Amino acid sequence: MSAKSKASGLSRPATASGLAAKGAPRDDGIVQHFPGLSLTGWLERLERLHPSTIELGLDRVRRVKDALGLDPAFPLIVVGGTNGKGSTCAYLEAILGAAGYKTGLYTSPHLLRYNERVRIAGQESTDAALVQAFEKIDAARGDISLTYFEFGTLGAMAQFIDGGVDVAILE
């Protein structure tokens, strides 16, 4: 089953529940924990949690980051711009890896599987590692609303810290 994008005519996978991120219900503010969810279950849940309006700013993410104690001791390389971000990140990962650095790479969006977004030392994150990171974030956030992307970014940082990377590259 897929949902058509009116603008592009492209199809995107619908969630198993049939809810797409746009128009999905908001989080009701009740703190619930969901142990035992698979990665697919977490991703579907994160799509439903996405607020209908995005609150600009970094305050919410900072509060959750602080609650988790995510203070990386390694350098962060942020690659931004319009074109070439993915290639630049891949080059940086390869160059730094060849120089003996243990790299963390976070990219978005993924092409086939969510796991592609988070890599440590060139290896995609496992479902179990992603689920563990999402569980930590969910427990720490309390009633703070986070977007799908913010959950993913915090999850990547948690994995990079736990994985002992020397440098992280963020697209």
Label for each model-derived stretch:
Residues M1-R26:
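A cross-taxon signal for low-complexity, glycine/charged-rich
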Residues S2-K6, D27-G81, T88-A90, A94-A99, ...:
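Short functional linear segments
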Residues L10, A24, L58, N83, ...:
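Intrinsically disordered, low-complexity sequence elements enriched in Ser/Thr/Gly/Pro
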Residues S17, R26, C89-L92, L112, ...:
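Ubiquitous "structural anchor" signal
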Residues Q32-F34, S52-I54, L58, R62-P72, ...:
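ATP-dependent carboxylate-amine ligase catalytic core
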Residues N83-K85, H110-L111:
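Short active-site-proximal "capping" loops at secondary-structure junctions
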